[in-house]
Amino acid sequence: MVQKLVRAAFIASLVCTTAGVVGVALFPAAQAADKVSKEVGEPLNAALEAIQKSDWATAMASIKQAQAVANRTPYEDYVINKILSLVAFNLKDYKTALTAVEAALASSSMPPEDKKDLLTNGFRLESQANNYAGIIQYGKQLEAIRPLDPDELSNLAIAYYNTKDVATAQQYAQKAVAAAKAAGKQPPQAALEITMNAQAKANPEAAAQTLEQIVLQTNSPADWDKLISVTFGTKGMTDVIAMDLYRLSYVTHALKANEAGLAGKLANQLRYYGDAVTILQSGGVTGPDLNSAKSNSAKEQGSLSAEIAAARKGSGQTALSVAEALYGYGRFAEAEALARDAVSKGGSKNPGEAQMLLGMSLVRQDKFAEARQAFISVSGNAAMTKVAHLWGIYAQIKGGSASGPAASPPAGH
């Protein structure tokens, strides 16, 4: 996104008018000999009046009148260039704006107190143009004058990354993340991505945690897909846990057509026929797997009422099996009730699955705070607790509290 140039100094403190002559109020009194002549001052005053009305075309026409005056002083050229940079920027003539900033910075008439704003504007214009050498040039000068904000640090990181100085890019990315957190803001996504890329080989777990921060900010299917794909390789992954991960992929809209085919086949194998139909159809998958899922789904739904009654009286595993079916058919309140029974009774073949299903059923009913607590309470191996952690992130996002960090996954046991 193009950042706005610093307008306050350009308009509020650049020029004041006395008897039709533009006088500059930027120098100390002892240096006030620099003035703008009436011939230059009148069109510049007209430009400033047009700027106040956001009439940029008129402002540019007035600046050109000032530029047409013969025998201008270096100070007059400095003032013209300073105003020109603002007007050209708002006319989206970024090349002219940058040229004007460069000329103002190079002027021997530039007041020292103007340097910070001019460097800031040069940095932003180079950032808008993706001119990495210019970003680095202005960024280093600006950093020597004042602390850089998270976005500026992130832009420097991007510039160094794209000029193949990965080590320096990582340093600025880390600074950007730290500065954002210190200010209570979300870190710039680019800084997180550069950090994650640097961590990928040396510290995969740290890279995954950084990717979680990105997902918390974007909630984009593409970022969810990256995070979920990495998680499939977690130690202890089983078919049941993988299915819970596919369910997450489905609700986050990260499930691709080829993955829908695999997920649907797995759902059929686990006898999650409702899930199989939903997932296969979502991916546009047709053929034997969908036909089988539809046939078995029709049979199962015809006997569900009896199965629910039996599950209420039966074991924890029986309650869990029926709850899984209810979840697949979108009957989330009933799935929640039986999942609670399964948690209470215990005896599941898959430790942690009853608690996991409880959390998923709560999420699908928009009970996000309860769901997060349910996911935190999931026990089991590393894969089970990791998948529960990701579902907890989803609940956190849907509950509107994604600005804070994700809760750490519980240790597997």
Residue ranges, per PLM feature:
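N-terminal leader/linker segments that initiate helical-solenoid repeat arrays
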Residues: 2-6, 10, 14, 21-102, ...
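Generic helix N-cap/helix-start motif at coil->alpha-helix transitions
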Residues: 36-45, 74-81, 111-121, 145-155, ...
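Alpha-helical segment of the N-proximal tetratricopeptide repeat
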Residues: 42-58, 317-334
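Residue at a conserved register position within TPR or TPR-like alpha-solenoid repeats
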Residues: 50, 88, 126, 160, ...
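Structural motif corresponding to the intra-repeat A-B loop/turn of tetratricopeptide repeats
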Residues: 53, 91, 129, 163, ...
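Alpha-helical repeat scaffolds
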Residues: 63-65, 95-105, 132-143, 167-179, ...
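Flexible internal linker/loop segments at domain or repeat junctions
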Residues: 289-325, 337
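C-terminal soluble interaction/assembly domains
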Residues: 319-413
